[in-house]
């Protein structure tokens, strides 16, 4: 591809992911809190539900949600926010999760251990006769099972409490497809949509987040063979490079190629299920 081709695709992707050319953190916070408040009220439901991992994304989304329900209550609408801790057994960075909960200050907090359900599903697959090609493949699949079990738990609580499930996907993760389809990618509302990672951090900082939360190294921490593996190791590019791409800055050809490969390869994750009416005809 030529430089002009790269630039054209970059502009199209930025528009598709709704990344604004300019960013005012205080105005952005107010807009997102108001959006969450209006969305919940318009639905007729009463509760927001979100899993809090300890990372900056869930911490930021959680604090925005708590501010939104407080805004609704101030206006006479009964609304609550439920934060869920969803560890897989003992979480390696549990101290970070507790720090995040203290920052979010949710109305209620529930803890559900997904390990028994995730392990039981894997054991059932193995007992059925399914054979994984390698231990690494089994570990990867098991990790996605954990992510989906977490969403099952959140939707169970939402179903019982007239709730809506919040997702933490933002423009950087969406660009790279770095989420589990129907796992952490399965949610009702995405308050961080359109934000680069550095802008998520800016929002968290403006909301009063501890620097240990704001600058925590992002990790899905789903794979037991590679615990706490940083997202950037999986990407092969840094979040700063991803954010530069999203904010319309010039990046190296290697970064362009890497980003576009991830973006094109994860297109199915950003789409509704295909039907024959979506498939192009000759």
From Swiss-Prot:
What GO cellular component entries does it have?
cytoplasm
The protein's matches in InterPro entries, at most eight in alphabetical order, are given as: NAD/GMP_synthase (IPR022310), NAD_synthase (IPR003694), NH(3)-dep_NAD(+)_synth (IPR022926), Rossmann-like_a/b/a_fold (IPR014729)
Q: Which residues cross the membrane?
A: none
Q: Tell me one GO molecular function of this protein.
A: ATP binding
Which Pfam families does the entry link to?
NAD_synthase
The answer on whether this UniProt entry bears the keyword ATP-binding reads yes
Catalytically driven reaction(s) = deamido-NAD(+) + NH4(+) + ATP = AMP + diphosphate + NAD(+) + H(+)
Family matches, as SUPFAM superfamilies: Adenine nucleotide alpha hydrolases-like
Q: How does it assemble?
A: Homodimer.
Task: Give the protein's function.
Answer: Catalyzes the ATP-dependent amidation of deamido-NAD to form NAD. Uses ammonia as a nitrogen source.
Name the UniProt record assigns to this protein:
NH(3)-dependent NAD(+) synthetase
Classification of source organism: Bacteria, Pseudomonadati, Pseudomonadota, Betaproteobacteria, Burkholderiales
């Amino acid at each position: 591809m030529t430089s002009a081709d790269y630039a054209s695709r970059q502009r199209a992707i930025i528009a598709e992911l709704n990344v604004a050319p300019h960013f005012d953190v205080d105005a952005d916070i107010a807009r997102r809190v108001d959006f969450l408040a209006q969305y919940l009220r318009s639905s007729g439901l009463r509760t927001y539900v979100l899993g809090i991992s300890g990372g900056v994304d869930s911490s930021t989304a959680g604090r925005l949600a708590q501010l939104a329900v407080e805004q609704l209550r101030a206006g006479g609408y009964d609304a609550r926010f439920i934060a869920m801790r969803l560890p897989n057994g003992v979480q390696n960075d549990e101290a970070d999760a507790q720090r995040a909960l203290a920052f979010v200050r949710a109305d209620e907090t529930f803890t559900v251990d997904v390990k028994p359900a995730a392990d039981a599903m894997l054991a059932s697959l193995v007992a059925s006769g399914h054979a994984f090609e390698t231990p690494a493949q089994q570990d990867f699949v098991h990790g996605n099972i954990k992510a989906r079990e977490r969403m099952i738990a959140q939707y169970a609580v939402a179903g019982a409490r007239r709730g809506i499930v919040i997702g933490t996907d933002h423009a950087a993760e969406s660009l790279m497809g770095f989420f589990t389809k129907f796992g952490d990618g399965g949610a009702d509302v995405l308050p961080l949509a359109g934000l680069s990672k550095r802008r998520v951090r800016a929002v968290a900082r403006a909301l009063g987040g501890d620097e240990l939360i704001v600058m925590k190294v992002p990790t899905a921490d789903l794979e037991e063979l590679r615990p706490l593996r940083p997202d950037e190791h999986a990407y092969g590019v840094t979040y700063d490079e991803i954010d530069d791409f999203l904010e319309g800055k010039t990046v190296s050809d290697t970064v362009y190629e890497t980003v576009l490969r991830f973006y094109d390869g994860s297109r199915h994750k950003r789409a509704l299920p295909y039907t024959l009416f979506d498939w192009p005809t000759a």
